[in-house]
C-alpha cells in the first residue's frame, strides 16, 4: 500500500476543498493511505499531519477556502527548514506529496524533490490563472463570477447616478481575471498589465463615450496596472468639463477569493485531483497537472518556473471591439 499526502499552499481559491476531496477519494480507490497536511509548508515543518478517509472529506465539495488551512511560510526559504520537512515526510513514510498551489508553491515543493528526493505532484490553483504551462487553474472561474456579480451591482449605481466607476480586481501582475470580468460585464475600458494603454488613450475612451451621450461608464483595472484610486483621481481631473456625476472607485478585494465554487471549478478540481492520483499510480513523479487544448495531461513541474503566461491577444482585441 502506498502512502500519499496532500496540502494546500499560498492564497486560497474556490475549489480547493473539491480538489482535496478528489485526491483523498481517488487515493483510497487505488488502495492508498492518505495524509492531510494542515497549514501547507508550515505543517510539513511542524508535522501537522492528519489521516484522511473518504468520509472525512464528505460534504466539502461546495465549500470555499480550504479545510486543511493554508499559510505562507517564509521559513521554507531556508535549507534547514526544508530538511526538517523532508525528514518529517520520510519518517511518516510518505511516497508522494500532492501540492495544490501556484507558482511559488510549486517552486518550493520542487526543492524538496531536488534536494531530498521527495516525489512531488503539483495541482495548479490560483484565481489569477497565471500558472505557466496550463490553460486553467482551480478557482479562476469562481473568481471571475464573483467579480462579475459585484461589477453588475456597481453598474446599477453607476447608471443611476451617471458616474464613471473605476473597479479594481485582483490578479497580481496578471490580467486574466480583469480581462474576463471586463468582457463579461461590457466594461467601457479594461486595463491589464500585459497590454498597457497610455493614460491619454484611457481618457479619450471615456471622453468619446461621454460625447456620444453616455452619462456613465465602467473601467475595470487589474491591480498590477495601478490602483483604482490613482486612475479615478486622474479621470476626475481630466473629465471636469463634462456634465456627469463624477468618478468613483471601488476595490473588490478578497471577496473574489471566497464563496462556494462554481460547477466548473468543482468539476475541474475533481478531474485534476483524480488525474494526479492516477498519474502517480502509473509511476509518474515530479509533475504538474495541466489543461491544454481541452485535455488534462502532466508536464514536468519546472515548466511553470520563471515564465510569464499572457492572456490571449484575441480576447484583448475582442474586448476592444466590443467597447465602441
Curated annotation (Swiss-Prot):
Keywords: Allosteric enzyme, ATP-binding, Cytoplasm, Glycolysis, Kinase, Magnesium, Metal-binding, Nucleotide-binding, Transferase. SUPFAM superfamilies: Phosphofructokinase. It is found in: Cytoplasm. The active site is at 128 (proton acceptor). ADP binds at residues 21-25, 155, 186-188, 212, 214-216. Its cofactor is Mg(2+). It is an enzyme of class 2 (transferase). It catalyses: beta-D-fructose 6-phosphate + ATP = beta-D-fructose 1,6-bisphosphate + ADP + H(+). GO terms for cellular component: 6-phosphofructokinase complex. GO terms for biological process: canonical glycolysis; fructose 1,6-bisphosphate metabolic process; fructose 6-phosphate metabolic process. Substrate binds at residues 126-128, 163, 170-172, 223, 248, 254-257. Its EC number is 2.7.1.11. GO terms for molecular function: 6-phosphofructokinase activity; AMP binding; ATP binding; fructose-6-phosphate binding; identical protein binding; metal ion binding; monosaccharide binding. ATP binds at residues 11, 72-73, 102-105. Pathway: Carbohydrate degradation; glycolysis; D-glyceraldehyde 3-phosphate and glycerone phosphate from D-glucose: step 3/4. Mg(2+) binds at residue 103. Allosterically activated by ADP and other diphosphonucleosides, and allosterically inhibited by phosphoenolpyruvate. Catalyzes the phosphorylation of D-fructose 6-phosphate to fructose 1,6-bisphosphate by ATP, the first committing step of glycolysis. Belongs to the phosphofructokinase type A (PFKA) family. ATP-dependent PFK group I subfamily. Prokaryotic clade 'B1' sub-subfamily. Homotetramer. This is ATP-dependent 6-phosphofructokinase. It comes from Persephonella marina (strain DSM 14350 / EX-H1). The gene is pfkA.
Amino acid at each position: 500500500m502506498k502512502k500519499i499526502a496532500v496540502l494546500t499552499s499560498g492564497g486560497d481559491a474556490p475549489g480547493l476543498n473539491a480538489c482535496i476531496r478528489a485526491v483523498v477519494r481517488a487515493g483510497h480507490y487505488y488502495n492508498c493511505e492518505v495524509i492531510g497536511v494542515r497549514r501547507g509548508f508550515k505543517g510539513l515543518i511542524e508535522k501537522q499531519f492528519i489521516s484522511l478517509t473518504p468520509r472525512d472529506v464528505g460534504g466539502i465539495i461546495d465549500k470555499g477556502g480550504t479545510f486543511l488551512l493554508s499559510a505562507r511560510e517564509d521559513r521554507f526559504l531556508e535549507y534547514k527548514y526544508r530538511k526538517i520537512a523532508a525528514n518529517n515526510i520520510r519518517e511518516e513514510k510518505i511516497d508522494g506529496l500532492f501540492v495544490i498551489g501556484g507558482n511559488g508553491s510549486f517552486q518550493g515543493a520542487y526543492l524538496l524533490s531536488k534536494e531530498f528526493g521527495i516525489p512531488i505532484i503539483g495541482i495548479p490553483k490560483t484565481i489569477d490563472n497565471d500558472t505557466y504551462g496550463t490553460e486553467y487553474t482551480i478557482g479562476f472561474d469562481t473568481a471571475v463570477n464573483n467579480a462579475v456579480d459585484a461589477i453588475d451591482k456597481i453598474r446599477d449605481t453607476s447608471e443611476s447616478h451617471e458616474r464613471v466607476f473605476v473597479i479594481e480586481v485582483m490578479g497580481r501582475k496578471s490580467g486574466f481575471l480583469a480581462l474576463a470580468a471586463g468582457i463579461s460585464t461590457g466594461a467601457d475600458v479594461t486595463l491589464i498589465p500585459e497590454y498597457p494603454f497610455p493614460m491619454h488613450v484611457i481618457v479619450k475612451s471615456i471622453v468619446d463615450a461621454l460625447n456620444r451621450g453616455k452619462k456613465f461608464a465602467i473601467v475595470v483595472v487589474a491591480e498590477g496596472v495601478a490602483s483604482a484610486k490613482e486612475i479615478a483621481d486622474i479621470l476626475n481631473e481630466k473629465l471636469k468639463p463634462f456634465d456627469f456625476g463624477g468618478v468613483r472607485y471601488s476595490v473588490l478585494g478578497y471577496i473574489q477569493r471566497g464563496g462556494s465554487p462554481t460547477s466548473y471549478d468543482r468539476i475541474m478540481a475533481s478531474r485534476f485531483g483524480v488525474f494526479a492520483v492516477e498519474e502517480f499510480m502509473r509511476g509518474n513523479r515530479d509533475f504538474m497537472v495541466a489543461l491544454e487544448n481541452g485535455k488534462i495531461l502532466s508536464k514536468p513541474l519546472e515548466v511553470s518556473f520563471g515564465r510569464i503566461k499572457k492572456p490571449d491577444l484575441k480576447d484583448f482585441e475582442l474586448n476592444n471591439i466590443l467597447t465602441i
